[in-house]
Amino acid sequence: MSDTSTLPLRVLFCCGVTQNFFDLPREQIGEVWQAYGKMLAAIESMEGVKVLGIMDDDRLTVGHADNSPWTFYIMADVRNFDTTVAVCNLYRTTPVGEYNLWRYGKIEARVGRALQVPPQHANAA
């Protein structure tokens, strides 16, 4: 098995919108989406972050879902814990008008490692 001290963290960033987003008048929603676009671009350009994919799951759940409060997910390999914190901090620093993105959304990071099947079990029939 690989030396886990040199491997990046495998992070699932769970992102959602809050009731403040749904309470906005239609003409103001676009400004929030533009902020999300800027935040996603900032994540993809961060040193120490390799975005593996972004999944949007609101095709079958429209609006706020209490049992699944997330709207989209970002799977990324991240250099270290501090870089993971910096990604989450973008919600505090990305402007949306006179506020910041965290007024309209939320983020949670699930940190782990890439799953690897031990070599002795990889080819077992």
Feature map (PLM): residue ranges:
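A common structural junction motif
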Residues: 91-102
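Conserved, mostly hydrophobic/aromatic
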Residues: 74
